[in-house]
Amino acid sequence: MGSIRNLLITGSNGFVGQSFLNYLEKLEERELPKKIILVNRSESKPISYKIRSRTEIISLTADLTKEWKFDTESSHILNLAGDGSKNAYTEEAAQNFIKICENLEIWALSHKPKVIVHASSGACFYGDSNNKNFINKSNLILSRIKGEKILARLNIELGTRVVTARLFTFIGPNILNKLHYAATIFIRDSMRSNLINVTGNPNTIRSYMHESTMSDWLANCLLNEKIEGIFSVGSSNPVTIRELAEFISLKTNAKIVFGNTKIEPSTYLPNNESNYKTLGLSEGPKWQDSVTECISIYSKRGMNLD
C-alpha cells in the first residue's frame, strides 16, 4: 500500500470500510498510502491514532447520490458506498446505488485515477430470473450489475484498471454491529435468551471469510495489476446455516429451534480456486475460529451493540 500516493475511500463508515481501516492500522508506516481521503454521507467515524499519526487523513462529507463536487487528487479509489442495511433490497436503495456509480464515472473522467476497486455483491451470480433467490433480491442484484457495467467503461475510456469486487459473506468484530445477518443474530440471541431461532431453511449454504482476510484481498485488488474485471471476494468453504447454528449452540449452550424447512435453500458461495493458485491468496482463519472470536467479543461488549 506504500506505493499508493492518494487513496480515496467512499463509504468508509460501513462494515467493509471499518474493516479495511482496521487492516491499515496493522501495517507499518512505510506500507501505508501517502494520503487517505475518506468520503461519507455523515461525519466520518474517528480514525485511530495509529493511522492518523503516520499518514495524512482528509475526511469529507458528501451525498454521493448527487454531483461529486469535492476536488481532490486520487490515484486509487476504493468505492464502498452503498446501502448495506436491511433496506438494501428496496427500489430506492437500488436507484441510489446506480446514481453513485454514475457520479463516480463522471468524477473519474475528469480526475483520471489509475485504479478503481468497486465493491459489488456476490449475489450478482444469480442469473436465472425464475430463481426465487434472484426474484427476492432483484432490486439489489440488477442495480449492482448495472453499476458494474457503468464503471467498467472507465477501463476503455481512460485505461483505468477497474476491479469489480463481488463481496460474499464475512465474519469478524465489525459484523457484530450488523443485526440483520444470521451469524450476528445467532450470537446475540444465544447470549441474551439462550435460544437460537433458525427461521429459514437450515440447509442454506453460506461461507464466512474473516473481515481481515477480506481487507487483505481488497488491498491486493488495489495493488496487483493482474487483478482486473470481476473478482470474487469470499471463502469457498461451504457452511450450512445448520452448521453455523449448531457450532454457536455448542459454544454458548443455547437451544436451537428450527423453523420452516420448506423454504427453498440457497447457495451463496464463490469459486476462488484460481485466486489461491495464481495470486497466492489465503482464505485466512477457519470460520469456527472467527465465530469463536465474535462470541468472545460479544460476551464482553454485547449489551452495547444494539
Predicted segments with their positions:
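Short-chain dehydrogenase/reductase
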Residues: 94-95, 136-148, 176, 180-184, ...
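NAD(P)H-binding glycine-rich loop region in Rossmannoid oxidoreductase-like domains
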Residues: 58-99, 128
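C-terminal substrate-binding subdomain of Rossmann-fold SDR/epimerase-dehydratase oxidoreductases
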Residues: 194, 199-306
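SDR active-site strand-loop-helix element
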Residues: 10, 39, 77-81, 116-122, ...
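Conserved Rossmann-fold NAD(P)-dependent oxidoreductase catalytic core, especially the SDR/UDP-sugar
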Residues: 102-139
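Conserved beta-loop-beta element that borders a ligand/cofactor-binding pocket
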Residues: 121, 148-174
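N-terminal Rossmann NAD(P)H-binding glycine-rich loop of SDR-like oxidoreductase domains
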Residues: 2-30
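A conserved pocket-lining segment of Rossmann-fold NAD(P)-dependent short-chain dehydrogenase/reductase
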Residues: 162, 167-170, 185-209
